Amino acid sequence: MAIYGIDIVALFFFGIHTYIMVYLYKKNHAYCESEPEKVLDMNDPNLPVVTVQLPIFNEFYVVDRLIETTVALKYPKDKLEIQLLDDSTDETVEKSRNLINHYKALGFDIHHLHRAGAARTGHKAGALEAGMKVARGEYIAIFDADFMPDPDFLIKTVPYFEDPQIGMVQVRWGHINADYNVLTKAQSFGIDGHFMIEQVARNGSHLWMNFNGTAGIWKKECILDSGGWEHDTLTEDFDLSYRAEMRGWKFRYFKDIVCKAEIPAMISAYKSQQFRWCKGSIQTAVKLLPRILRADLPWRIKSEAIVHLINYSVHPLMVINILFSAPLLLMDYWSGFSFYDLPIEILMGTAAILSVGSVGPMIFYAYSQKTLHKDWKRRMVYLPVLIMIGTGIAIVNTRAWLEAILGIQSSFKRTPKLKIEKNTDVLKERMKYTVPLDFHVVLEFLMGFYCLGTVFLSFALGKPQIVGFLAIYALGFFYVGYLSLKEAAWKFGASKQGSTEELPAQA
């Protein structure tokens, strides 16, 4: 009973935190709007050298798009260096080499830095570190393979480094395929919530925020002063961000400067991505929280940093909540005790607390859509899907959370990019890279049936008060499990035709 009570209180506080984020957004969002007059003079002979790093690993479908959008950046050729940090193990290497040679012949300062064998260590962080050792830029912009920076990205972001305290500038992620399928529509809600509300709330309130691994630009001095890229976590971006902020560096975030990206259109890719983000953030919490708590910092910064670092703890809390539901129902029935025997004030107060906490995330995501889209009400139809996949990945993320807490190491499994840009693109024809089906799908269906069984138990015992949230959990687990099996069938069919291969882990 005590564990369940603590679990409920913890979930409540995570829910309340979403209200705080919305409040801080409304109060301070103007700080995260760029200044139109702050644009580079392209004729200035004193413009700084900028290095653009493009870390890739087996990106056959999208490497050409990545390079083409990067060479289109508006910046003097003699002040722009491009590094393709290639850890690929397939024909992407040859394709990349040909592309680099083509643009070199056109006068671009572009380099193909391919790591192979024993040199390919440290995942993405290792590649960024290797590239930085030979980079000539004073500033380093980073774009993952699924991103397409606008030509004016550098023109709009570099001017903010006039403030010597600024160590990094991050921009908002946009979407090129948000409307491709139900899954991408739901994911766009989640991404918009983070980038439109959370990042603005933190940066606008002068709280700590994080570089999101891509679509941002660093001052090289800041990276070096903060200890450089380290690869003992799966979220090297989160880790470096907090180490830099502990050193006193300031970050800027702009919600009106957008870098478009491709959203994973397959549930297996989404689950793999969430596993990495969850495990990496908890690894970063284990690594840095002791330092943060000991640091001489205002409590408002410390408290938000704690919540930010452990935010993925909501998923194991969900699992605990589910698993304890049936035993508590039975204990309540066998003991003869009824919650209805409690004073009405306690009953009403408890109901109000639970309702306020659970509604918070829905308000949070709905508000992000309201700030972005005039037709936001029409888009609300996909909010329940976000809630379903958010609960359905609780099994995957609980495993990630436990592995991080227990110090279990795992390989960096990057998210496959399939160049799904238009609604007419056929997903089944882009099966070259796949994430294999794993045992999580079995646990997802088991949890779905457990929730369903607890629903029937609630009715049988005459205690239907928890049926609503159990039904949502059940739908979430069944939906994610169904999508996983559906994709597995596609992959099986593709493998019969020899058009698929499992994506190897990145060393």
Question: Where are these predicted regions, by residue range?
Answer:
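Membrane-embedded multi-pass helical conduit in multi-pass membrane proteins
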Residues: 3-7, 25-27, 35, 39-42, ...
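N-terminal signal-anchor transmembrane helix
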Residues: 20-79
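Loop-to-transmembrane boundary segments
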Residues: 62, 294-317, 422-452
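Acidic donor-binding segment of Leloir-type glycosyltransferases
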Residues: 68-118
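The conserved acidic donor/metal-binding loop of glycosyltransferases
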Residues: 88, 144-148, 232
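A short, conserved beta-strand element in the Rossmann-like catalytic core
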Residues: 90-91, 147-149, 174-176, 239, ...
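Long helical/loop segments within the catalytic core of UDP-sugar-dependent glycosyltransferases
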Residues: 100-139, 151-234, 245-246, 267-306, ...
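Catalytic donor-sugar/metal-binding loop of nucleotide-sugar-dependent glycosyltransferases
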Residues: 232, 241-260
